[in-house]
Regions:
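Solvent-exposed interaction patches of small proteins and small membrane subunits
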Residues: 1-141
Length: 141
């Protein structure tokens, strides 16, 4: 269920991400600006779903004691589902910047960071999907 929610969010993000070219970010184009607004919002949504829903579901499956976000991220790193805890702390900070609208004076820089970080979220969701499939296969035998 959490993975399905994550996949729907990832599909929406991928749809928007595929319309953007890194070198065009910062151009004065109303259509591009609208697409970039959708990109940042969808990025923040997927990051939120991964940390608050998908990763928490993994914690439950692992019967782990991980209440704090840092503990959750450490567990995900130990399981090989994320590249590093530090990277995800940066992603969480990026999401907070989007949601709380900090750094709006340099919106193109923020949008470039989101564009470049999007594949990390997509890879992570795929890794968690593989993990879930292996857990399901292990429990059915």
């Amino acid at each position: 269920e959490q993975l399905e929610l994550g996949q729907r969010a990832a599909d929406a993000l991928e749809h928007t991400w595929s319309k953007v070219r890194l070198e065009r970010i910062g151009e004065s184009d109303p259509e591009l600006e609208e697409t970039l607004e959708a990109l940042t919002a969808r990025f923040a949504r997927l990051e939120d779903i991964l940390i608050k829903r998908v990763f928490r579901a993994v914690v439950a499956v692992e019967l782990a004691d991980a209440e704090r976000v840092l503990d959750v991220l450490d567990l995900m790193a130990r399981l090989g589902l994320i590249e590093s805890t530090d990277q995800w702390i940066e992603l969480k900070e990026l999401r907070n910047t989007i949601v709380h609208e900090y750094e709006l004076d340099d919106l193109p820089a923020l949008q470039r960071r989101v564009y470049q970080a999007t594949p990390i979220l997509q890879r992570t969701l795929k890794a968690v999907s593989r993990y879930a499939a292996s857990q399901a296969a292990g429990s059915s035998s």
